[in-house]
Amino acid sequence: MYDPLRAKVKVALYSAIAFLVGLAITSGLGWTSKSYAMPVIAETAQISPEAVQPALDLSQAFTNLADAVTPAVVRIEARRPVTATNQEIPDAFRRFFDSPEGQNQPPSQGQVAGGSGFVVSEDGYILTNNHVVEGADEVKVYFPDRRYFDAEIIGTDPFTDVALIKVNAGEPLPALSFGNSDNVKVGEWILAIGNPGFGNSASLDFTVTAGIISARGRPLQLLQNELRSDPRFGDQASRWAIEDFLQTDAVINPGNSGGPMVSLSGHAVGINSAIASTTGAYQGYGFAIPINLARRVMEDLVEYGYVKRPRI
């Protein structure tokens, strides 16, 4: 006798068996539902040592160069009398000083400006920018090893923005050798080293940045414009001011003035001097005085205390 309930149970039972058999077969074939699949962990791509060796070599060159050069770089503090504060510091260079613009120290202290420099002889001669030390009645020099000394201003040259100072350390100092800035090529790697401190902070001292030579022989009219407005020089500004800057994209900021621009061979090829900026901070354009020009100025300052120029 036909029993509808029993028939329904049989159909359900056969359907369940068929489903389980089908599931077992598909699982064995690897057709598992995606919702239950284990995530596949990708293996890290293997890069051959040969492929990255040039980059590693360049990185190691930067490291070796920074280690070798930094001991010869110094931080400079130049104290100016209050009477000289607004007259001796050109507006175009004021952004390079640690002291905020328009903010002076008490009259008894004068104004302290910060900059950089680098030792060029074991007996303590140091190159820097004229605008870092001009008009100062007291100059202190700080080394990376925490030593510091009073410095004597040997001479300054506003027409090239080069200055020479000297310290007496009582022992030979680490010094940078001169490169040949005439041989520097556009696209060549360089390092810029200095002290981009802000607000008299030493927390950023001896910062190393890298970049390339972006251009050569840049005449910015920076020195001419500043000197032309100075009653000490008048029309001599356009006659004697020399602007032949090396341009770089290495980061240069306030306090870097006077620090070295160094080639990968470890030679100084320039003196960091200025930036082109609408904000007073780095925007991709830094400029350095070619070391060949600075060296000629230095030699005259050592011998005469000033730069001898031909006169007609």
Where are these regions (language model features)?
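N-terminal Sec-pathway targeting helices
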Residues: 4-16
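Hydrophobic membrane-insertion alpha-helices, especially the h-region
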Residues: 13-27
